[in-house]
Amino acid sequence: MGKIADTPMMVQYHEIKAQYPDAFVFYRLGDFYELFEEDAIQGAKILELTLTARNKNSENPVPMAGIPHHAAQNYIDILVDQGYKVAIVEQMEDPAVAKGMVKRDVVQLVTPGTKMADGAGGDKQNNYLAAVLPAKNVWSIAYVDLSTGELRATTTGRFEDVMDELSSLEVKEVVLSKNDVATTEQQIASQLGERGIVISAQGTAEPSATVSFLTQALKVTSEIEATTILLNYIFDTQRRSLDHIVPATSYERLKFLKFNQDTRSNLDLVENMRTKKKAGSLLGLIDRTNTAMGGRLLKQWLLKPLRESSDIEARLDLVQSFQNDFLTRGALQDHLKSVYDLERLAARAAMGTMNARELVQLKRSLRAIPGIKSVLLQADTTLSNAGQQLDDMTDLADLIDVAIVDEPPVSVREGNIINDGFDERIDGYRQVLKDNQQWLAQLEIDERAQTGINSLKVGYNKNFGYYIEVTKANIGRLATDRYQRLQTLTNAERFVTPALKQHESLIIEAQAKRTEREYELFVTVREHVKSDISRIQTLAQHIARLDVLSSLADVADNQRFVRPTFTNQHVIHIMQGRHPVVESILDAGDFVANDVILDESINMQLITGPNMAGKSTYMRELALIVILAQMGSFVPADVAELPIFDQIFTRIGANDDMAMGQSTFMVEMAEANDALQQATANSLVLFDELGRGTATYDGMALAQAIIEFLDKHIHAKTLFSTHYHELTVLADNHTSIENVHVGAVEDDEGQLHFLHQIQSGPADKSYGIHVAALAGLPKELIDNATSILHDLEAGKMIVTQTNDQVASAVIQPDAHLSEQVALFDMTVTDDKTQKILDALDNYDILNMTPVDAINALNRLKKMRS
């Protein structure tokens, strides 16, 4: 694209663009941000802007597109939400007084991980930016939410854990050290880049005093380095005060119940796996928080349940108190509805972007605190203690109240922000303006009297200032020596007099000084807020916690949840357990509850029964009860006695990863291997229909081997559902395995009815054909399948028909399980067939991706033809 090197402005633009080649450069030009060249072409498409050109008639016109500066934030958000970066270039001096080219510089680089939110939107999502640092045999992760100030770090020995942590946090952008990009880019980019996560690089540098202060509590060297990289990136890109970022804290992942992204997805924890929305997920059910801070904290608790029983019990005590005291809970929640996003308001104050309306939002939030405190202090000891921790910050609320008007404008540069009586100078300027307005009104009366023109009026125009307007029919009645023509209209003339000019100067001067003074005082108040950021953040943490706990109590009350108890024994004792999300979408009383009892002698339940009968629901409900209990929530059951679990592993549903070239069976085996390698006796393992992705006897053999490995080596509490009824005999030889099944009955007409109840012993048959009939398969097909099934059960033959022949394979009643049944006649009849068979022999089927398989099939088809 052509460049106009001899234009000073374009030279300046290219110098800036060279520093930010991967970002859209928003170049401030008067009242607009301009995009040039490729930025303009691409930006016009994404943002639906009009594409024009600079120097249209030249040999190389420069594409450009403009955005009004007051509307820029909306366009920036669109680009950043799609994974782009935006460099904001501002004029660093007043163009009216600048000598030569106006100085410009990048004041902020907005990226997916540094995007800010306001304090009023009620956004319950964190926006995390992370840094990942490979060290000797470990990986360290540091992450920050710039919009709240949260800064944390952790270390793990496995790259898979890094990916799980980033996935759990829903990180939008990952920063790598420039020194590590070459060595780690392939490993990270292949798994992050394809998932829409932006990868950025940051050079290493000696930590500043601020960075050293923020990392002083960290003890692990690699965590300090990762956090330093992260903070240096933020300071380089944001170029503003970041006093709201709290000192980094380190946490051990072992202190939390661990589960990976597949488990989060399989259990619909934070979003429904099918719709990808919050509705239909566990979070959607239990989130009754009234503040944005509470909503974010609830999600954090859900994704990081605890393993320390004393911490869990402390949460449960508060939930219990709120559940027992409906009036206190209701009053608290009413007050919480008046609280804005304190964390993000504090962040905006620190960064200097807080406007007057947000100051009022802060004041209104603080005004709700005394009411919250009063309600809690009148409750039981547990809640009263929580209330005593609240700082109502009446000093700050009073300052904002006395200084800032209740309904300020959005702009902080146009005045009308400061209350009357707060500042003598502003009051003086306002009096001057008021006096002059009265003078203008009197001028109009006097001019009408002197001229006899009753239609004469005094007005104001932004371009021409104050004027006297007279219709053309009355022009002759004016004394020409006093009136100076200012503007000619179609039906009127506008004039100015020396006296009017003099008063206009007084008005303009008073307005400018008033506006300047109001902004000065507004900044003073905002700086006062900034000095109290740590108090606001501490208050926000307390409010968020109260919001979450009262929300959980509300759910417990409305959903009939009970308080779980924890035991040091290796037992699960759940009476009338329920799947909370499934129950919530059914009519009252329709959900069939089930007991889950695994005492110290039983580690595994082998679950059989027909498809659609509820095996997966039974398994999921146990996992959800465990997660709810360890996050500090009541649970959907009549009784729930549980051990403290360290990890949950699930394989539920067929989650093929076609994009990663992995088949159902490969995913099954990878997830099973993760459990077999990582699970302990304190883990919970849920395997649903493992082995279905391969040949029947291969799958059965693997399923049996996995069951026996779990039983012999791991001893984890396990629910293992299977359609291989032959495996039920394992319970005869393994005393820690018990058979259960999901009940179903046939009526007199042969129709199948699911009971959805877990019953002792193995299922007598799978009812697969009944399920196929329920799915609506043709009756002819169902009848044929029934006939074939009877033949198989009698040890007869399977018959497959083609256009040319009928080939039979006889199943002997005493055939060993390991013998595969040949369904097709594979006799070689010619060279072409032999070539095809040779090609098949050479294919590495187990390591083929779906795309490889399709290409291979196409080659075989060509060989045949």
Swiss-Prot record:
Entry keywords, A to Z: ATP-binding, DNA damage, DNA repair, DNA-binding, Nucleotide-binding
Keyword Mitochondrion included in the entry's annotation: no
Molecular function GO labels: ATP binding; ATP-dependent DNA damage sensor activity; damaged DNA binding; mismatched DNA binding
InterPro entries in the cross-refs: DNA_mismatch_repair_MutS, DNA_mismatch_repair_MutS-lik_N, DNA_mismatch_repair_MutS/MSH, DNA_mismatch_repair_MutS_C, DNA_mismatch_repair_MutS_clamp, DNA_mismatch_repair_MutS_core, DNA_mismatch_repair_MutS_N, DNA_mismatch_repair_MutS_sf
Binding site for ATP: 609-616
A GO cellular component annotation in the UniProt record: cytosol
Keyword S-adenosyl-L-methionine: no
Family: Belongs to the DNA mismatch repair MutS family.
Function summary: This protein is involved in the repair of mismatches in DNA. It is possible that it carries out the mismatch recognition step. This protein has a weak ATPase activity.
Stated name of the protein: DNA mismatch repair protein MutS
